[in-house]
Amino acid sequence: MGKLLSKIFGNKEMRILMLGLDAAGKTTILYKLKLGQSVTTIPTVGFNVETVTYKNVKFNVWDVGGQDKIRPLWRHYYTGTQGLIFVVDCADRDRIDEARTELHRIINDREMRDAIILIFANKQDLPDAMKPHEIQEKLGLTRIRDRNWYVQPSCATSGDGLSEGLIWLTSNHKL
């Protein structure tokens, strides 16, 4: 009944899992979307979950810590995920290969096979930040042909690119 009412009145929900290496900007993105302002963050041990409403879509966003010791726990959050937001620190060239390995580990899990993939190419405001086409190549996205993915340049602290990412999720998910 709830789904029927959602279809009639236009309220849609989407479960989003936001992952990425530690210090990529996941929590900053979550609270910039939720509160519209930058907040002081500390490394996430465990998770944060918030509902972000944008253009009559309720995004239930799960932001899970990215430290290497926590990453094995990520799979416990996969079930029911409709959209993956993978956040990359574009100024961290030393760990882009590590980010690629983790991204492919996530998307190759059978629980995540139906999730659409949004990459926030974050920290675009920093000098020498990798541009979206470079992120696309270094993450091995061009070889992924059977999945719906998109790279959105972003700056979590200013909010640049964040709403565009939500628009992409909304228009590419079968609600």
Swiss-Prot record:
Tissue specificity comment: Expressed in the head (at protein level).
The keyword Iron is annotated on this UniProt entry: no
A GO BP entry: synaptic vesicle endocytosis
One Pfam family, short name: Arf
Key word Transport present: yes
Tree of life domain: Eukaryota
Entry-linked Gene3D superfamilies: P-loop containing nucleotide triphosphate hydrolases
SMART domains: ARF (SM00177), RAB (SM00175), SAR (SM00178)
InterPro entries listed in its UniProt record: Arf6, P-loop_NTPase, Small_GTP-bd, Small_GTPase_ARF, Small_GTPase_ARF/SAR
Subcellular location field: Golgi apparatus
Residue positions of covalent lipid attachment, annotated as N-myristoyl glycine: G2
Record: residues binding GTP: 20-27, 63-67, 122-125
Activity regulation description: Activation is generally mediated by a guanine exchange factor (GEF), while inactivation through hydrolysis of bound GTP is catalyzed by a GTPase activating protein (GAP). May be activated by Efa6.
Reported consequences of knocking out the gene: Results in enhances preference and sensitivity to alcohol. Fails to develop tolerance to repeated ethanol exposures. Conditional RNAi-mediated knockdown in the eye results in aberrant compound eye morphogenesis, with defective cell intercalation patterns associated with altered actin dynamics.
Alphabetical UniProt keywords: ER-Golgi transport, Golgi apparatus, GTP-binding, Lipoprotein, Myristate, Nucleotide-binding, Protein transport, Transport
Main localization category: Golgi
MF terms in GO: enzyme activator activity; GTP binding; GTPase activity
GO cellular component, one term: presynapse
Alphabetical list of NCBIfam families matching this protein: small_GTP
Family indicated by similarity: Belongs to the small GTPase superfamily. Arf family.
Protein task: GTP-binding protein involved in protein trafficking; may modulate vesicle budding and uncoating within the Golgi apparatus. Promotes cell movement and remodeling of the actin cytoskeleton during compound eye morphogenesis. Required for normal ethanol-induced tolerance and preference. Probably after Efa6-mediated activation, counteracts ethanol-induced sedation.
Name of the protein in its database record: ADP-ribosylation factor 6
Native species: Drosophila melanogaster
Top-level taxonomy: Eukaryota, Metazoa, Ecdysozoa, Arthropoda, Hexapoda
